[in-house]
Amino acid sequence: MKTPHKCRVPGLSIGCTSFIIPDYYVPAIRECVHYADDIALLLLEAGDHGEGLITPAEIRELAGIAADAGVKWNVHLPTDGGFATEESGRRYTENIIRAIDLTRELEPHTWVMHVVTDHIPGPDMRLHLTERETERILRSLEQITPHLPAPECLALENLERHPTDYLDKLVSATPHSRCFDIGHVWKEGLRPEELLPLWLPDIRMCHLHGLEKRDHKSLHHMPAATLDAILHPMWDIRFSPLITLEVFSLDDFLNSHQAMLESHERYISKH
């Protein structure tokens, strides 16, 4: 285990995922609080009826740990579902609501949600949502909203293999927010710095991760110019939403933090 220390970046708010420590939720979070001020609780697999979710007893323990450590939460909602059919959409919505209700005790600032028609993506770019799919998803979001402390606490995440404007109609038609996943934009060979000003009014939080054969790897794999192209404008505008370093090992988290510090040094040297 590395010597614990809080990882912070001047002028930006960063956090880690609950997966940087390979353990069950409670022992993992006991370690995570030493490294970050904000933790993404990843509840990725709910099962058919929520049987795969964290237990209420574990949530109570996590609430106590976080209160003692002074850390904040965001929650990544289950991803093992989607809106391909009316029935799959109904099950997925029920599990999303279960996860929100279960974690309300933690008082998260954000719940992050995937909006997909098929939760097992193929290799090809997804088409835009059809009118029927859009209506199905909007009905689901209407059911989810009453379970939130405020509608903007739900952030819809952009995904790889989906058009960048895939979520535009949903965001404009609802009071919900965006989770800007920068790594997913890089994975498609696109430039997230071009999307930043377009999406800025709706961004609740960000996911940031590098690419090395696949995504969700350390930022130190990214060319300095690529990382600077998105981070330097954030410092320019005093970007305030949380940036979760969405990596799944402690080494990748610490190396990503170091890469951000080096980017900040380059930023300072130019100003």
Residue ranges, per PLM feature:
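Active-site beta-loop-alpha junctions enriched in small/polar residues
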Residues: 17-21, 42-46, 78-82, 116-118, ...
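Active-site acidic/histidine proton-transfer and metal-coordination neighborhood
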Residues: 84-177, 240, 268-271
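Histidine-acidic metal/acid-base catalytic patches
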Residues: 2-13, 27-31, 82-85, 93, ...
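N-terminal pre-domain/capping segments
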Residues: 1-98, 270-271
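Structured helix-beta-strand junction loops
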Residues: 35, 69, 150-151, 174, ...
